[in-house]
Structure formats: C-alpha cells, structure tokens
Amino acid sequence: MPDITRRRAYTTAAAVAATASAAAPTAAPAATAAARHDHTAPDSFDEVYKGRRIQGGPASGGGHHHEHGGGYAVFVDGVQLHVMQNADGTWISVVSHYAPVATPRAAARAAVDELQGAPLLPFPTN
C-alpha cells in the first residue's frame, strides 16, 4: 500500500468538506422559507397617521397586469400609493423603495414619514 502524500490527504479532505457543505444547507433554507411565506392576505386598514389618512385593502380589480401589490391597494389621502411585495414577503413602495417593511400598513406609514407633509402625486402608469 503506497504512503499517503500531503497532496492526496489535502485533496481527500477538500472533497469531503465540499460534499458536506453542499449537502448541509439544503434542508435549512427550505424550512426557513416555508416559515417566512405566509399565504394569508394582509389585513385591511383605515387610519389617520400623522394627520394623513392611510388606507389599504384587497385591490378592486381594474385589470392592471403590471401591478405587483399582490392584489392589495394602498392609498394616502385618497391617492394610490403603488406598493409591491418582495419575494421574501416584505413590502416596498415607490416613495420608500429602498426600505422594505413587514406590512402594507408599514409601507404607507413609511411613505407618510418620507413625504414630510408633501402631497402624494399620482404615479403615471403609461
């Protein structure tokens, strides 16, 4: 039986480590992804936040195929705030696009904070 060289031992150890690291994460992300995706629709809301009326609820149709709100509409003082649900379940809006939040209500509140009293202007959709 030939002597084991350092190169052969290193190659074997690297192969074992690569196989172990490739097999280990396959079960964990599936479990966390299942826990993260809640397939229930967000609750409707209608409240005054910092003097602005914010509303949200299931979208009433309209036939817009380009909307990404997942069938959910949000309004600030009667003007639609375009929202989008990310793949990880967080929400963003056109006003606070780089600050994902947990719910459409939080997206509306973040938009009010960002607007600092300025009116929300209608977003052109073509």
UniProtKB/Swiss-Prot annotation:
GO biological process, one term: melanin biosynthetic process
Post-translational modification: Predicted to be exported by the Tat system. The position of the signal peptide cleavage has not been experimentally proven.
Keyword Signal attributed: yes
Keyword Membrane applies: no
GO molecular function, one term: copper ion binding
InterPro entries: GriE/MELC1_sf, MelC1, TAT_signal
Ranges where the record places region Disordered: 21-71
UniProt feature, compositional bias: Low complexity: 21-34
Domain of life: Bacteria
Pfam families registered for this protein in UniProt: MelC1
PROSITE patterns cross-referenced by the UniProt entry: TAT
Keywords carried by this UniProt record: Copper, Melanin biosynthesis, Signal
Annotated signal peptide: 1-33
Reported function: This protein may function to deliver copper to tyrosinase.
The family this protein is said to belong to: Belongs to the melC1 family.
Protein's name according to its UniProt entry: Tyrosinase cofactor
Native organism: Streptomyces galbus
